[in-house]
């Protein structure tokens, strides 16, 4: 890589110029902007070529340049996955394309099995079939790398098995550090494949003990779970500060919080009443009161630094790793029945059609009339439970919600009502049940009030020309839409690529399906076709909600993005102290980091649920269970247990002695001799062969020995389609 010659602009300066230019920026425009001599223009040409090779820029028609945000032709990759088919996948170690998901590249190895998860390689990359492949140029010597695993003893030697179900290799242990067989340990890797060894640096206890599953995720994803001493001291101090006299007093209103029965914190509360403004006939007034976290957590404070490092709270079935110290998150900031609390109040004027006629924000003091569980609020409205606040608080909320719901139906947001799993534990942390979480009107009511407040927050800041940390959800990419079209064709469902894609486009597909058996998997495929939402100071709209401006405002106890929006509102409306905001590039970096922390939390929560599900199902190993196929690959298929969840592999080697054709577009395996078909969404009984609570992995077999194979099995992959389908059928 050539270094810029003296007099030439730096890469950063060129990127800044291209980004800020109001017209196409070619070599001539760049040279003129930086006043380059004829000799320096020669160096500029070489520099621009280097930047293109590095993936920093690309040339548009007419030789204008733009920031590419793509994969460099030569880059350092970190190995992140080795799938069941033996394919190795890596991701760029550095990725600076804001808002663009980090790509996964399939790595072509000279020696199969020579690379392991966590290794770093220098690789040459190229596009192939809509995806990326990488050719390893050399491996990079690793720094000290840690692995979480379980010790196993065999013939006097100790071996370490990783808790990561993607990392299937065992490592010989050179030093147990006093740990015993069966212990969950943190170890350091040494050496390189195939001679990697491990040295135990911390003993964590019994991996099968209640509450260990979340501990595994905390260690694996390096989630900060201990506050700095100065943070705890500061939290104790600010918790005692008075609320002040310059707050709007809302304590006489019957404001209520409606939350899950097991909620650990209470960010939000709501109130509604008919509007007596003659300019808003049959309209409503609503207040969404949100915990005033910005009053307690000031920019640059010790609490703020710890919160920013975490990005959000992480919720597990047995514990929460809070973004804020417990004295704030579970007590002083949390809105509680009968106690005075500081709030940032969003006052809405809602028309009879559910439109926002006006909005304003104030700092207030509230005293909740009640904390009510979703189930109790729903039962009270349905007449199944007598509640003293039914007529004074709940009924007006439901009536105002009818207007908000009408506006929501008119804008037609994406409506994918997919069930969530809920793990129920006893007091000792043992699993009582795993079941889909019930979805009530009470849930939808609170969602619509929160969405209305989030929209008001974004628009209020735009009106004040203040910085906004938007919640962005972009339109699905063409690549994902093509994959969805191919999938829908297998059910004879038309999907025109030439149409303008809106959320309603997908809703109509679901409506046409009706109550067909394959409806859940079609909804899952539509969900997979969507882009991942993220935080950014540049507004790209929220596709899924069908909204032009959207920001997260309603959960500052558990999301740093919401705290940023609170500070912006406090500053824009001159509501007192705590309104300082990051600016420019720092705001962009903050959006990127909290988006990454959000994804980290989601993965940790999902993996922990998988471990609990595997533990729950471990008592049913050997039994035949009803399943549904959730992903088809060239090495088998994945299935989930009805009513419980958890993805498990049905290896192709156990499907009998047939040759199987893998059709990527229809997501199915077809037996050449038997004509047996295994396709996405298919329901079938399978025997649960293995359930590993430590890794969360499940494995299935065909029932009644149907999988016994008299001859070698193999898969014949249908040609002409890119090999970019992975676990759960996702395109990367």
Where are these regions (language model features)?
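Charge-lined substrate channels and their catalytic hotspots, especially those that engage the 3′ end
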Residues: 1-287, 294-339, 371, 378-379, ...
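A short, compositionally biased micro-patch
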Residues: 60, 82, 154, 351, ...
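A generic structural motif
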Residues: 85, 131, 155, 195, ...
């Amino acid at each position: 890589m050539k270094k810029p010659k003296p007099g030439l602009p730096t890469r950063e300066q060129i990127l800044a110029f291209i980004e800020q230019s109001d017209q196409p920026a070619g070599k001539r425009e760049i040279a003129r902007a930086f006043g380059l001599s004829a000799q320096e223009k020669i160096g500029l040409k070489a520099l621009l070529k280097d930047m293109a090779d590095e993936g920093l820029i690309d040339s548009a028609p007419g030789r204008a340049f733009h920031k590419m945000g793509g994969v460099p032709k030569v880059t350092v990759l970190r190995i992140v996955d080795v799938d069941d088919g033996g394919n190795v996948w890596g991701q760029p170690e550095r990725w600076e394309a804001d808002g663009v998901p980090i790509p996964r590249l399939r790595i072509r190895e000279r020696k199969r099995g020579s690379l392991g998860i966590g290794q770093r390689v220098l690789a040459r990359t190229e596009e192939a079939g809509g995806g990326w492949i990488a050719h390893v140029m050399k491996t990079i010597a690793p720094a000290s790398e840690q692995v979480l695993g379980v010790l196993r003893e065999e013939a006097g030697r100790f071996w370490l098995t990783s808790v990561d179900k993607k990392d299937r290799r065992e490592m010989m242990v050179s030093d147990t550090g006093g740990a015993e067989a069966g212990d969950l340990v943190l170890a350091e890797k040494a050496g390189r494949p195939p001679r990697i060894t491990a040295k135990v640096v911390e003993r964590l206890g019994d991996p099968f003990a209640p509450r260990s599953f979340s501990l595994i995720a905390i260690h694996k994803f390096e989630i900060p779970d201990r506050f700095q001493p100065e943070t705890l001291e500061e939290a104790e101090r600010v918790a005692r500060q008075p609320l002040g006299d310059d707050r709007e007093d809302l304590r006489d209103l019957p404001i209520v919080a409606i939350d899950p029965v097991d909620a650990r914190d209470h960010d939000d509360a709501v109130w509604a009443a008919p509007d007596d403004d003659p300019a808003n006939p049959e309209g409503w007034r609503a207040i969404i009161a949100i915990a005033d976290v910005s009053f307690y957590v000031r920019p640059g404070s010790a609490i703020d630094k710890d919160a920013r490092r975490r990005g959000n709270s992480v919720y597990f079935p047995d514990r929460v790793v809070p973004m804020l110290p417990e004295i704030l998150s579970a007590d002083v900031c949390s809105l509680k029945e009968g106690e005075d609390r500081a709030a940032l109040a969003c006052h809405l004027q809602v028309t009879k059609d559910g439109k926002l006629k006006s909005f304003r924000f104030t700092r207030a003091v509230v005293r909740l009339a009640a904390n009510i569980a979703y189930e109790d609020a729903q039962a009270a409205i349905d007449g199944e439970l007598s509640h003293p606040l039914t007529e004074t608080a709940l009924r007006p909320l439901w009536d105002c919600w009818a207007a908000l719901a009408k506006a929501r139906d008119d804008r037609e947001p994406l409506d994918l009502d997919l069930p969530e799993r809920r793990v129920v534990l006893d007091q000792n942390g043992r699993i009582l049940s795993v079941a889909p979480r019930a979805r009530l009107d009470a849930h939808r009511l609170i969602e619509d009030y929160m969405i209305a407040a989030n929209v008001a927050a974004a628009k209020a800041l735009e009106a004040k020309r203040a910085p906004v940390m938007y919640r962005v959800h972009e339109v699905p990419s063409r690549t994902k839409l093509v994959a969805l079209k191919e999938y829908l064709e297998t059910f004879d469902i038309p999907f025109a690529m030439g149409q303008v894609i809106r959320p309603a486009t997908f809703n109509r597909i679901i409506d046409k399906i009706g109550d067909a058996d394959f409806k859940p998997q079609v909804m899952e495929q539509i969900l997979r076709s969507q882009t991942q939402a993220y935080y950014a100071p540049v507004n790209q709209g929220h596709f899924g909600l069908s909204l032009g401006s959207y920001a997260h405002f309603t959960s500052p106890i558990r999301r740093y993005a919401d705290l940023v929006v609170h500070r912006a509102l406090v500053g824009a409306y001159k509501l007192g102290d705590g309104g300082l905001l990051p600016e420019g590039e720092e705001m962009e970096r903050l959006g990127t980091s909290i988006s990454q922390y959000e994804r980290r939390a989601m993965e940790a929560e999902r993996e922990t649920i998988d471990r609990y599900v595997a533990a729950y199902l471990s008592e049913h190993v050997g039994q035949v269970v009803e399943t549904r196929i959730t992903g088809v690959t060239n090495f088998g298929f994945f299935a989930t247990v009805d009513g419980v969840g958890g993805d498990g592999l049905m290896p192709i080697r156990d499907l009998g002695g047939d040759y199987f054709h893998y059709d990527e577009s229809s997501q199915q395996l077809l037996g050449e001799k038997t004509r047996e078909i295994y396709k996405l969404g298919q329901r079938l009984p399978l025997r649960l062969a293995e359930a590993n609570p430590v890794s969360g992995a499940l494995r299935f077999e065909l029932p009644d020995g149907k999988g016994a194979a008299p001859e070698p099995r193999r898969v014949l992959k249908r040609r002409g389609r890119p090999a970019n389908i992975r676990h759960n059928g996702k395109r990367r």
